[in-house]
């Protein structure tokens, strides 16, 4: 199965998990690199690995741990039946306790095993558009954590 169709787990995707070292997904990285599906970028303290212009993995080089996994574009995987293209209405039906972070423009699910996930929608959310929940779709979703040395 293509990594683009993998289901999202609370801590990652396939061999790529938050807090793991790059060695944990070395085989996947090597296989996808040989197929021409991987691009590497360097940022301050981070190695950024881009799979098929649809999955971005940020590895904290100070700790050699995966700090963030983001899903975009052609990613077809789902997280509890929520994925790119899902509407805000379906998301809110599935997660009625979800909260919106006005400053960062994403939804998250507090006090749950999924609170490290952020769901970004195509337009900034506003209560004025609350009656148009079926018209607002997810355009990317990300697993976010802050790396520690533990």
Q: Could you describe each region identified by the protein language model?
A:
Residues 1-115, 120-150:
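Short helix/turn-capping signatures at newly exposed starts of structured segments
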């Amino acid at each position: 199965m293509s990594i683009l169709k993998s289901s999202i787990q609370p801590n990652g995707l396939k061999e790529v998990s938050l807090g793991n070292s790059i060695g944990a997904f070395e085989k996947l990285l090597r296989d996808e690199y040989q197929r021409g599906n991987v691009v590497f970028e360097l940022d301050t303290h981070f190695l950024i690995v881009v799979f098929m212009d649809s999955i971005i993995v940020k590895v904290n080089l100070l700790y050699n741990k995966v700090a963030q996994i983001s899903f975009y574009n052609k990613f077809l995987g789902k997280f509890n039946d929520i994925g790119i293209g899902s509407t805000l209405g379906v998301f809110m039906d599935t997660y009625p306790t979800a909260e919106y972070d006005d400053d960062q423009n994403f939804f998250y699910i507090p006090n749950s095993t999924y609170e490290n996930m952020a769901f970004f929608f195509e337009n900034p959310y506003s209560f004025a558009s609350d009656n148009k929940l079926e018209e607002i779709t997810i355009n990317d979703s990300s697993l976010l954590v802050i790396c520690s040395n533990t």
